[in-house]
Amino acid sequence: MKVEVMSSHRVHPEHKKASEETAILPVIDSWYCYWRTLAAIYLFDAYSGPELYTDLRQSLSKTLDDFPQLAGTLDNCNIQVEDKSGRSVRRTRVTWGGNTLGGEFIEAKTNARVRSLLPPSIQNISSFAWDRSDRTLRPLFPATLPETSGIRVQVTSFKCGGFGIALDMDHALADAHTVGLFIGHWSAIHTRMFTSTTTFPSQISLPNVMFNPQFVEKKVHETDNTYGSKMVMLDRARELPTRRPDLRDKSSQRTMQGNMFKPPPKPSAGVPYLLHFSASEYERITRGIQQATASPQITDQVAFVSFLWAALNKARARCSVGQAVDLHLPTSFRWTLGLPEGLIGSPLVAVMMDGGPDGEVCYTDPVVLATIITKTLERYTEDALLAIVYDASLRDSPASMLRGFERRERMEFTSGVGFGSDKLSFGCHSPVFVGPIILPVDNLFIMAEGMRTSEAHSSKWYKHGANIFVSLPQDVFRALLADPALINVELLGDI
């Protein structure tokens, strides 16, 4: 697919502040600074307005009035530690307003059709596997900017009258929740500006936006601040299997010192696939695992992650490509700490779970893995998360995207479920496809809601099925699909 970039504009809030403003980002959020969120693409089959680019650019600027920090730039500074040591630590700072560069809005066009980028036959009542390698979305991704740049948006018009919105931003400023919050507000504002509709039922529940970088750290200061309690917090934090910028893998104890910086890992060498599970198939898999464990603590998403983890381990064993892989699973502070729903930022950590020694049968049993995941996540209580924040406050924030990359092969799973993509509409049109543009590493599984193709009489998030985006070596993927547990997954095309 050829895409022609017609123009590029710097984008700022509609009511941009005349003077610059700055804020020190939370320490936990800063662990993800200088990484971009996984760029998402929203594809629409039509636009009802006369000026696609102008309309979207205007509504984007208006939306940034509530999210001005997302158009800011990042840099590093040193601050004094609040103790008697006089020690300073490196922190990440965001600057917005004034003469800052802002974000980027790219206008592009292509002679391709939106439907050419969709699976040959999308039917939510069936489960399928689709090789996306010849349906690359990479040309729809915003052009590369310096790592300190703000939000990036590329709007691409298609020959058929449809359009695509590609979106990414710095991960320290926005986790998946914040991305969903932002696109939800943009959708609502755009619809109010450019349609005659007076009611917006899907956007009524949008929370007010809140930028309060010290919100979580204030919770730490509200706890017992005696020396003994602080040492207990440090011990607790360091006993947890939490991934840090200087500890990227459980097998690595290297620190960010001297010449131990390494270049980023090589890009994915695998093939991008989409696995779609129908609602009934998703329920069959997850309920089977939940019933086998007889534990009410095992949620449907934990059960499904354990299913995928076990299937990947079995596939790797069939291909003789290595031992069972570790699982890295993000856990958010938002719900455990009761953070405001409209709080923007990236308050999360990744939890590392052992894949087990080579040949261990239990690591191909999803029931065992579901129990391991649940018991590990149960350790991340409110007190544990506050301990992690305190421990992080004594460390430097990353100086750049170059950080320790000592790691072994692993599975990573992240969920985009529940962040409102099924409620979006720009004008009168809802997206016909939402997904990541690229998968930067192999064994990364991204789960999202299936797209609506018909009415579903259910309130469950997977009422239209569940989509899993993943990049795997072709032989591993073939072995994965040979698993009897995936017998109901239909192959689309020749993979």
From Swiss-Prot:
It holds the Pfam family Transferase. Coiled coil: none annotated. The active site is at H171 (proton acceptor). The keyword Transmembrane helix does not apply. GO terms for biological process: secondary metabolite biosynthetic process. Induction: Expression is induced during the early biotrophic stage of development. Expression is positively regulated by the ABA cluster-specific transcription regulator abl7. This is Acyltransferase abl6. It comes from the Eukaryota. Belongs to the plant acyltransferase family. Keywords: Transferase. One of its GO terms (molecular function) is acyltransferase activity, transferring groups other than amino-acyl groups. It comes from Leptosphaeria maculans (strain JN3 / isolate v23.1.3 / race Av1-4-5-6-7-8). PANTHER family: FATTY ALCOHOL:CAFFEOYL-COA ACYLTRANSFERASE, TRICHOTHECENE 3-O-ACETYLTRANSFERASE. Acyltransferase; part of the gene cluster that mediates the biosynthesis of abscisic acid (ABA), a phytohormone that acts antagonistically toward salicylic acid (SA), jasmonic acid (JA) and ethylene (ETH) signaling, to impede plant defense responses. The first step of the pathway catalyzes the reaction from farnesyl diphosphate to alpha-ionylideneethane performed by the alpha-ionylideneethane synthase abl3 via a three-step reaction mechanism involving 2 neutral intermediates, beta-farnesene and allofarnesene. Its EC number is 2.3.1.-. The keyword Endoplasmic reticulum does not apply.
